From Swiss-Prot:
Annotated source species: Mus musculus (Mouse)
Residue spans of biased composition, Gly residues class: 58-68, 125-137
Impact when changing E446Q: In Mvh(KI); heterozygous and homozygous knockin male mice are infertile due to derepression of transposable elements. Defects in piRNA biogenesis. Pre-piRNAs fail to mature into piRNAs
Keyword Cytoplasm part of the UniProt annotation: yes
Residue window of motif DEAD box: 419-422
Protein name: ATP-dependent RNA helicase DDX4
Subunit structure: Found in a mRNP complex, at least composed of TDRD1, TDRD6, TDRD7 and DDX4. Interacts with RANBP9. Interacts with RANBP10. Interacts with PIWIL2 and MAEL. Interacts with BMAL1 and CLOCK. Interacts with Tex19.1 and, probably, Tex19.2. Interacts with RBM46.
Domain Helicase C-terminal per the UniProt entry, residue ranges: 503-648
Residue stretches making up the Helicase ATP-binding domain: 292-475
Length: 702
């Protein structure tokens, strides 16, 4: 029909919309232009348009693509970048609903032409859902739809109002149709009119897919090994493990139970004792000596202990002992699973690590641990839970999704554990944690036992913890280690921003193949530095929050096995990760807080092993860390560079900057409750007492 009269199409809604004719079963072709051009002859499109179309990614001129929603009855499953849905069933029938439009909001207009106006300002968007503006054709699903006389999605080309509406001001065609979505409604889609936006809903599994959530996650992590040797593979303790006995421990609160010296004193069941022995645990660490009897006594606990000191076992063992003694309620034969224990951690890698520890200690018992986290298929998480769940290990986002979709009940929760609790209660996850304890069915803090563990507990975090803990909770502070582990040799180098890469390569070449973690501040920089090191012939991988879960797990696997001895990471890997034989940590970028510095360098020097941490200090951006760094180095009996001391004494730090830089403080984190009774300070062997620290001010590191 030659050049189409676009004005007539716009201003005369009774004229039927032009719909290009497609050959059946050929929507899966690669480029939009190719598919369209095969039918352009029958559609009276000129040869010149055809040539122009083939030179771009879309149809009808440069910068635009012809899109196709395809068959919305699960006939098309995968989309490509061109806007077509790849066909998974060759038996698609013509009477299925189809909806097509011109993409890139272009219509016949160049999508990049900012001078366009009037009806050509916006056309349709032809990718999935018919999208905004443009020509769309909705074929009814049944004859009754035609008889009802109502159009199901939109009406005029470019009209924001429903087709059944007669109101308008003459230039409604410049807006969008169907409440902001062009064309007509397609199959399995709800269009809600009356507002400027369209509420679109698709019949997808679990309701995960939405406009804002992006593509549906299909990744299912491989199951962990089931053989006993793999389950009980353990971390070898280092030469300094016995030095833990010299660390001071402060327990504050009323009527704290006495510490234990051996696992036998805990009176655990024989199965647990056997699993402890298989895991290679022969001696209690300081946090375990005090935390295990406190949890066994049913008391709420806030425990602060150095990185790599066995905090996970300190809460898992007594919880499992309670479950073995009191019995469990969850069963795979129950329709709704109601876990007795919920453990929450801030990162996927850490919560998976906790799950593996829970599976290890519960081996051969009736207790079943389950782990769920984001980046994996939602249905997979549900399937794991319905098989039986006594201990639920979860990241905050996936946990709230599971609760919101009523896949678990909370009435039986007896134990709530927040690992890396300072991170869980800050502005990052604090609101979600408050939602958790406010969920219907969740027992109040007086009816459950709440345990908080971390290597650092700033004062403001302790105040927030009051919403989670009973007022009679006990506080355990393990020694002077909230600053840094003494088994880590710390080195601070003064390196400018533009000299860091050269210095990093120099250090890594001297290190050789020893396992090294390099921390940077941003996700983009993590990939950039990893690529740069690979170009320098240094095998490197990276991990950060923007990588898919499959890629994150692959990166960790390559790092653990030594395939890539260098791992460039953001703070997603700074907390809790227990990777054997990490000899070096390099802070390419120093973090914004000293607490994060402590967690980062804690990836090495674990369980009595020695390690080395090197940090690049940029005087243009890191001066705020000078004073707390001097304090951390001094407390860990490390050499403090003279230039760093000079910067520290010349830099003003607000009084509220740090709770751990208290003058003369013995403990890096102390109980902030005022006028409490029963505070006592002991060495970890429990033989003698030492004088409690002097009162300190209210400075804060955070």
């Amino acid at each position: 029909m030659g050049d189409e009269d676009w004005e007539a199409e716009i201003l005369k809604p009774h004229v039927s919309s032009y719909v290009p004719v497609f050959e059946k079963d050929k929507y899966s072709s690669g480029a939009n232009g190719d598919t369209f051009n095969r039918t352009s002859a029958s559609s009276d499109i000129g040869e010149s348009s055809k040539k122009e179309n083939t030179s771009t990614t879309g149809g009808f001129g440069r910068g635009k693509g012809f899109g196709n929603r395809g068959f919305l009855n699960n006939k098309f499953e995968e989309g490509d970048s061109s806007g077509f849905w790849k066909e998974s069933n060759n038996d698609c029938e013509d009477n299925q609903t189809r909806s097509r439009g011109f993409s890139k909001r272009g219509g016949c207009q160049d999508g990049n032409d900012s001078e366009a106006s009037g009806p050509f300002r916006r056309g349709g968007r032809g990718s999935f859902r018919g999208c905004r503006g443009g020509f769309g054709l909705g074929r009814p699903n049944s004859e009754s739809d035609q008889d009802q006389g109502t159009q199901r999605g939109g009406g005029l080309f470019g009209s924001r109002k429903p087709a059944a509406s007669d109101s308008g001001n003459g230039d409604t065609y410049q807006s969008r149709s169907g409440s902001g979505r062009g064309g007509y409604k397609g199959l399995n889609e709800e269009v809600v009119t009356g507002s400027g936006k369209n509420s679109w809903k698709s019949e997808t599994e679990g309701g995960e897919s939405s406009d804002s959530q992006g593509p549906k996650v299909t990744y299912i992590p491989p199951p962990p090994p089931e053989d006993e040797d793999s389950i009980f593979a353990h971390y070898q303790t280092g030469i300094n493990f016995d030095k833990y006995d010299t660390i001071l421990v402060e327990v504050s609160g009323h009527d704290a139970p006495p510490a234990i010296l051996t696992f036998e004193e805990a009176n655990l069941c024989q199965t647990l004792n056997n699993n402890i022995a298989k895991a290679g645990y022969t001696k209690l660490t300081p946090v375990q000596k005090y935390s295990i009897p406190i949890v066994l006594a049913g008391r709420d606990l806030m425990a602060c202990a150095q990185t790599g000191s066995g905090k996970t076992a300190a809460f898992l063992l007594p919880i499992l002992a309670h479950m073995m003694r009191d019995g469990i309620t969850a069963s795979r034969f129950k329709e709704l699973q109601e876990p007795e224990c919920i453990i929450v951690a801030p990162t996927r890698e850490l919560i998976n690590q906790i799950y593996l520890e829970a599976r290890k200690f519960s081996f051969g018992t009736c207790v079943r641990a389950v782990v769920i986290y984001g980046g994996t298929q939602f249905g997979h998480s549900v399937r794991q839970i319905v098989q039986g769940c006594n201990i639920l290990c979860a990241t905050p986002g996936r946990l709230m999704d599971i609760i919101g979709k009523e896949k678990i009940g909370l009435k039986q929760v007896k134990y709530l554990v927040l690992d890396e609790a300072d991170r869980m209660l800050d502005m990052g996850f604090g609101p979600e944690m408050k939602k958790l304890i406010s969920c219907p069915g969740m027992p109040s803090k007086e009816q459950r036992q709440t345990l908080l563990f971390s290597a650092t507990f700033p004062e403001e975090i302790q105040r927030l913890a009051g919403d989670f803990l009973k007022s009679s909770y006990l506080f355990v502070a393990v020694g002077q280690v909230g600053g840094a582990c003494r088994d880590v040799q710390q080195t601070i180098l003064q390196v400018g921003q533009y000299s860091k890469r050269e210095k990093l390569v120099e250090i890594l070449r001297n290190i050789g193949d020893e396992r090294t973690m390099v921390f940077v501040e941003t996700k983009k920089k993590a990939d950039f530095i990893a690529t740069f090191l690979c170009q320098e012939k240094i095998s490197t991988t990276s991990i950060h929050g923007d990588r898919e879960q499959r890629e994150r797990e692959q990166a960790l696997g390559d790092f653990r096995c030594g395939k890539c001895p260098v791992l460039v990471a953001t703070s997603v890997a700074a907390r809790g990760l227990d990777i054997e034989n990490v000899q070096h940590v390099i802070n390419f970028d120093l973090p914004s807080t000293i607490d994060e510095y402590v967690h980062r360098i804690g990836r090495t020097g674990r369980c009595g092993n020695t390690g080395r941490a090197i940090s690049f200090f940029d005087t243009d951006s890191d001066n705020h860390l000078a004073q707390p760094l001097v304090k951390v180095l001094s407390d860990a009996q490390q050499d403090v560079p003279a230039w760093l001391e000079e910067i520290a004494f010349s830099t003003y730090v607000p009084p509220s900057f740090s709770s751990s830089t208290r003058g003369g403080a013995v403990f890096a984190s102390v109980d902030t409750r005022k006028n409490y009774q029963g505070k006592h300070t002991l060495n970890t062997a429990g033989i003698s007492s030492s004088q409690a620290p002097n009162p300190v001010d209210d400075e804060s590191w955070d």
